[in-house]
Amino acid sequence: MNNILSEEVLNVTDFTTSRQLTLWKREDLQSPQLDDVAEEVPVALVYNGISHVVMMASPKDLTHFAMGFSLSEGIIDSPREIYGMDVVPSCNGLEVQIDLSSRRFMGLKARRRALAGRTGCGVCGVEQLNDIGKPVQPLPFSQTFNLGNLDRALKHLNDFQPTGKLTGCTHAAAWVMPSGELAGGHEDVGRHVALDKLLGRRATEGEEWRQGAALVSSRASYEMVQKSAMCGVEILFAVSAATTLAVEVAERCNLTLVGFCKPGRATIYTHPQRLIAD
């Protein structure tokens, strides 16, 4: 197995395909021409030789995705419980082969579920409706964020969507430092997958990634709130709206949820005490 920090070294063009498309503009149906379309492939997460989940995803940053999914789904509590990963092609897509600790693998087998992937679907394969909104340890109130610094982050979020710039087809998730600087970010055709990539990256970065907040380019669903809380993220900013269940879960687990984030404005759904308005 390769070191868990190993990543696929590919160019942005490896995540797009040129296809012949016909463009329409008012009163003008143009002749077919080549344009970029985002790649979407089945990605199987295989723990100790057993396939656990198949998700539709962009074929990059997959070790970060596997780490983030493992943490946000409660398969592991610490990156140290994964000993290594390899990304390998399979007949229909890609596999991330994960070397999981024996103790965690026994627990995984006890709760095993088969997820058949729609794009970034966080609910597919849950065996009972009662499994939705599983209990999350309430978060501490150890973080604060000055909303005056959010504009800087919003301005540069698009920098982490190179495939999105070519295709208009990806979501982004980025880590915002207290200063508003973006420490890093990831993109994917699935918003949940983009967030898992960010959470996996954060788990393997240094202490500077402990302070700050997560920022997503999409709406905030309950799964995204729950994944963030499972990974100890206290503040989640979303460019679009939040759902009612997302607000309920955020309230229950002490997560500060903020939606409709635009320059100079935002909607605070839960726990505003972490936020400073300058």
Swiss-Prot record:
Keywords: Cytoplasm, Molybdenum cofactor biosynthesis. The keyword Cytoplasm applies. InterPro entries: Cytidine_deaminase-like (IPR016193), FdhD (IPR003786). GO terms for cellular component: cytoplasm. It comes from the Bacteria. One of its GO terms (biological process) is Mo-molybdopterin cofactor biosynthetic process. The active site is at 121 (cysteine persulfide intermediate). HAMAP family: FdhD. NCBIfam families: fdhD_narQ (TIGR00129). This is Sulfur carrier protein FdhD. The lineage of its organism: Bacteria, Pseudomonadati, Pseudomonadota, Gammaproteobacteria, Enterobacterales.
